[in-house]
């Protein structure tokens, strides 16, 4: 029987890199965002609506139905350990624990300003495509504001999701800092294996590759999920205006750095 674990956390923080590294292990299957979380959410809505027939669905049937979504989606994968990826899984820690009592969630994280900067850098490399990260891409201030929206923002929403999961079930979650993964990949991955309670696999950190052109084309951003060769840290040039840097730096949104589960409140 397959074991199912999860990857969530913040965007532009190494989740694709982490998946690519994990995939070197012949027992592991890890990929970027799957539709399983969305289908799970829709299924939960469907079987808990006011439809009279839903009252005949037992607790065991609900569990079997939802478990079947995972089993069916990954049925063709012959590897014994699956890592499913979604930014929303940290909002469903109680659900995941009930379905997979052993499971854990790996959550890559990074400084918020660095994430915004990374999105701006990568999107600037596709100048002939509309930026799909924000509805209003007239200027960098509007883009960052929309990316940080707590409900729909590509950065703000995952940040709130992560805080929810870490506040309710912190023992299920390992926060994997991007810089640590890049600077000390072996040390970081040994900590990951220890957290997962799996025997360590000797990875080749000089030859890590991954790409998904289909997904990236859907986002109108080339190389959004591309990993090439050696794992190393290359500090990017900051292209954000100083006003934006100061605004989000002063908010101290990186709750994992000061070990406080603070309320995230920002405009």
Residue ranges with predicted function:
Residues 85-88, 96-122:
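Conserved phosphate-donor/acceptor-positioning beta-strand/loop module used by diverse small-molecule
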Residues 14-28, 96-100, 175-200:
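PAPS/PAP-binding and catalytic site of the sulfotransferase fold
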Residues 16-19, 38-40, 90-93, 113-118, ...:
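Short catalytic/ligand-binding loop motif for oxyanion handling, primarily in non-cytosolic enzymes
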Residues 69-95:
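Glycine-rich phosphate-binding loop used to anchor ATP phosphates in small-molecule kinases
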Residues 60-76, 117-195, 249-252:
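PAPS-dependent sulfotransferase catalytic domain
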């Amino acid at each position: 029987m397959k074991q199912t674990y999860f990857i969530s956390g913040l965007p532009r923080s190494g989740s694709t890199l982490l998946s690519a590294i994990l995939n070197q292990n012949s027992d592991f299957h890890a990929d970027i965002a799957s539709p399983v979380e969305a289908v799970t959410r829709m299924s939960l809505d469907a079987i808990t609506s006011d439809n009279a027939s839903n009252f005949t669905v037992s607790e065991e049937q609900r569990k079997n139905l939802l478990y079947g979504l995972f089993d069916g989606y990954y049925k063709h994968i012959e590897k014994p350990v699956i890592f499913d990826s979604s930014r929303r899984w940290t909002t469903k820690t109680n659900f995941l624990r009930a379905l997979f009592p052993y499971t854990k969630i790996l959550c890559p994280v990074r400084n918020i300003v660095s994430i915004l900067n990374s999105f701006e850098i990568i999107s600037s490399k596709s100048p002939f495509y509309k930026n799909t990260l924000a509805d209003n891409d007239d200027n960098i201030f509007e883009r960052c504001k929309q990316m940080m929206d707590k409900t729909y923002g590509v950065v703000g929403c995952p940040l709130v999701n992560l805080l929810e999961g870490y506040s309710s079930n912190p023992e299920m979650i390992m926060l994997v800092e991007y810089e640590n993964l890049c600077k000390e990949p072996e040390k970081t991955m040994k900590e990951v294996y220890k957290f997962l309670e799996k025997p360590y696999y000797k990875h080749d950190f000089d030859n890590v590759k991954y790409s998904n052109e289909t997904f990236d084309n859907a986002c109108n951003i080339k190389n959004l999920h591309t990993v090439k060769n050696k794992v190393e840290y290359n500090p990017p040039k900051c292209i954000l205006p100083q006003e934006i840097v100061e605004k989000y730096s002063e908010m101290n949104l990186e709750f994992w750095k000061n070990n406080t589960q603070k309320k995230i409140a920002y405009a």
